[in-house]
Amino acid sequence: MALYAIGDLHLCLGAPKPMDVFGGNWVGYMDKLKEGLSVIGSEDTTVLLGDLSWALDLASAREDFAWINQIPGRKIILKGNHDYWWSTASKFYKFCEENGFSDKWILNNNHYVYNGWAICGTRGWFFEEERGSDHDEKVFKRELIRLETSLKSAGDLPKIVFLHYPPLYKGYRCEEILELLKCYEVRQCFYGHLHGASHGLALEGQWDGVEYRLVAADKLNFQPYQVLF
């Protein structure tokens, strides 16, 4: 039994889109993902950190979720900035039921438990007051509420946070998110979103008592990162 994490699968079976614009290592990435994800077993849990599919709606995402359905075990899903198919949790679960897709769970205003650890998280957002718009500020504040709701729901359990957007990288710190992680004594924080040359902006390792790690698929060479045994 193990807990894995990987973000940014960028599946495009129902909405073909070239991915090599993000770098040459995306060539043949579907085959790389299939091989990399083969380490996951039926007793494992995998957190998918957003940007799962390029589809614009759930119907168009059916082939991509059929592919995800082949990943064994429990799949916990959070939203990325390119998940335009994203709908309400009830519509997503109905879609999964109608298509025979099993063991997929939305991480949004809630938490899940793995071996005594709380899996918390939300999409996150970039916002800098001097450059942000009113829309960005509203989305950012909403994401802060969702993250704190997720953390609160876990009570006294030790917490691991999963985000799509990085809460810090070279030249940027999202102080509000970092303060929440500190306040709720989060041990580890995993994030995605950064690709190609942007990997060089990622900050990984210990910062203020929290361990950060980038788990975008191309950063991991399309192999899931093992968070816990």
PLM feature spans:
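Metal-dependent catalytic neighborhoods of phosphoester/phosphodiester hydrolases
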Residues: 16-17, 49-69, 84-100, 130, ...
